[in-house]
């Protein structure tokens, strides 16, 4: 809370460059940033605006990608493709979503033909309903199995924090909450290490009566950003970057 999507993206880009001091910001050849709801503080071509706000020279171009759940992945593969064909040597790819500021579907106006002509089913417009249809199609994916997967995911995440495996990829960011005021966020929003099967079993299924999708076994509504530095092998070796 109390943050902007573009500022979250700026924090990620600046943190990325701080961790790679051998990279001259002026050498960045492109910035591809994904966002699903491209409006408000994550509109205005978020790739270009985040590049400028991050302090990159105005000679560095940027563009935005809208591919919903696969947006940031598409940013990475698009930049990787540009590098593989020789269009770029070094560039930044990432994504941002501030679901606290922009609930899913905010400001959208789906064409009536989608439903009138049965181009898609009505429940295709809501991800939770789509998830219920997946349970219908694959009956072996029971609610108990989904709950157990969710619980194990939470437990593995908690252990990864204890082992220090996640912190190296995080960038501390200022955030504000009604309870604590301004704080520094050092942990992702999603982890709930106290998750139990009993607790998950008691959650409501908001997308269908007696359904299988709950707030505990589905994707969270989070605010966050990510950025990655991509380079050709030759450029990485030239700059002495660690190839991952």
What is each stretch, according to the model?
Residues 42-43, 101-104, 178:
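Short glycine-/acidic-enriched loop or helix-start segments at secondary-structure transitions
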Residues 65-96, 135, 139-166, 227-237:
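Active-site-proximal alpha-helical scaffold in enzymes
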Residues 3-4, 35-89, 122-129, 194-220:
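Conserved catalytic cysteine-centered active-site region
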Residues 2-11, 22, 145-238, 242-243:
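N-terminal extracellular/periplasmic Venus flytrap/periplasmic-binding protein-like
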């Amino acid at each position: 809370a109390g943050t902007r999507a573009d500022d979250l993206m700026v924090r990620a880009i600046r943190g990325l460059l701080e961790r790679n001091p051998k990279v001259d910001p002026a050498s960045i050849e492109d910035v591809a940033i994904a966002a699903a709801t491209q409006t408000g503080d994550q509109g205005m071509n978020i790739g270009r605006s985040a590049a400028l706000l991050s302090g990159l020279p105005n000679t560095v171009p940027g563009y935005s990608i809208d591919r919903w759940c696969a947006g940031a992945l598409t940013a990475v593969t698009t930049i990787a493709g540009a590098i593989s064909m020789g269009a770029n040597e070094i560039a930044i790819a990432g994504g941002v979503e501030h679901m606290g500021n922009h609930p899913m579907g905010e400001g959208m106006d789906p064409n009536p033909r989608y439903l009138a002509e049965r181009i898609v089913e009505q429940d295709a417009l809501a991800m939770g309903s789509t998830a219920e249809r997946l349970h219908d199609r694959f009956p072996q994916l029971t609610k108990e199995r989904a709950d157990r997967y969710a619980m194990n995911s939470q437990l593995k995440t908690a252990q990864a924090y204890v082992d220090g495996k996640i912190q190296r990829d995080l960038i501390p960011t200022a955030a504000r909450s009604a309870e604590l005021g301004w704080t520094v966020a050092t942990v992702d929003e999603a982890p709930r290490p106290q998750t139990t099967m009993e607790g998950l079993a008691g959650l409501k299924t908001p997308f269908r009566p007696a359904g299988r999708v709950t707030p505990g076994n589905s994707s969270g509504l989070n605010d966050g950003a990510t950025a990655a530095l991509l380079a050709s092998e030759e450029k990485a070796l030239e700059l002495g970057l660690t190839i991952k």
